[in-house]
């Protein structure tokens, strides 16, 4: 037999009403959680039982959801009522103008202007404000100077490191150059010794052609002498 349809009206029996509330509340919380997860929705649910007990669920922060709801409601009201939106912006403009005037007035007072009606207490408060401003300015200046000094020290350390690396490379290149010169000088000395030894070696006789050239030279000299 099929389940009968429940009439949507207040349940008179207190026990049945509490049981139904517990079941429906659990299902509602489950659906809200599923909606937030499946649809990536920002969900906030608040339920008060007939006894005043609070039950709630929020996918993120309940406070942020409520604030967002209130802002959306105000925006919706402004869209529905253009005159209300115009008044809102008029109030904003008036507030901003007043803030600008106050800033100009305070600035003139800090410069020593418009203080003719000041009492001793007012002047003391203004002096304290100026001293606090100067203290903040000095602290900011000291902070910036310290940061600049730190940057310069870091750059100096980097330059020293680069110079050290260049000095090492120069020493290596200089040492290699010295070794290369030694090898070249050693090779030249060996070649000179070989040439000298070859010219002084008696074991190496002249070729017949060289002997003939020498004889011809001697004959030519004798002919010159006879003439």
Swiss-Prot record:
Any GO BP: positive regulation of transcription by RNA polymerase II
Keywords noted in UniProt: DNA-binding, Nucleus, Transcription, Transcription regulation
Entry keyword DNA-binding: yes
Gene Ontology CC entries for this record: nucleus
Chain segments carrying region Disordered: 183-227
Cross-referenced InterPro entries: MADS-box/MEF2_TF (IPR050142), MEF2-like_N (IPR033896), TF_Kbox (IPR002487), TF_MADSbox (IPR002100), TF_MADSbox_sf (IPR036879)
Basic and acidic residues biased stretches: 198-227
Polar residues compositional bias, start-end: 186-197
Tissue expression from the record: Expressed in seedling roots.
Domain of life: Eukaryota
Domain K-box: 86-176
Keyword Nucleus among UniProt keywords: yes
Functional note: Probable transcription factor.
PANTHER family in the cross-refs: SERUM RESPONSE FACTOR HOMOLOG
Protein name according to UniProt: MADS-box transcription factor 25
Organism: Oryza sativa subsp. japonica
Lineage start: Eukaryota, Viridiplantae, Streptophyta, Embryophyta, Tracheophyta
């Amino acid at each position: 037999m099929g389940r009968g349809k429940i009439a949507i009206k207040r349940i008179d029996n207190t026990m049945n009403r509490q049981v139904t509330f517990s079941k429906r509340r659990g299902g509602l919380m489950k659906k809200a959680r599923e909606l937030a997860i499946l649809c990536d929705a920002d969900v906030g649910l608040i339920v008060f039982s007939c006894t005043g007990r609070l039950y709630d669920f929020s996918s993120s922060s309940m406070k942020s959801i409520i604030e967002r709801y209130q802002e959306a409601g105000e925006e919706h009201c402004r869209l529905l009522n253009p005159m209300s939106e115009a008044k809102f912006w008029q109030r904003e403009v008036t507030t901003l103008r007043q803030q600008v005037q106050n800033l100009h007035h305070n600035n003139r007072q800090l410069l020593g202007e418009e203080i003719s009606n000041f009492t001793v207490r007012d002047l003391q408060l203004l002096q304290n404000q100026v001293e606090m401003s100067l203290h903040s300015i000095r602290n900011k200046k000291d902070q910036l100077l310290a940061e600049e000094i730190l940057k310069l020290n870091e750059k100096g350390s980097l330059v020293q490191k680069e110079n050290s690396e260049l000095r090492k490379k120069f020493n290596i290149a200089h040492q290699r150059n010295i070794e290369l010169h030694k090898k070249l000088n050693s090779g030249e000395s060996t070649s000179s010794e070989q040439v000298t030894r070859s010219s002084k070696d008696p074991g190496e006789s002249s070729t017949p052609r060289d002997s003939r050239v020498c004889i011809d030279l001697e004959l030519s000299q004798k002919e010159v002498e006879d003439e």
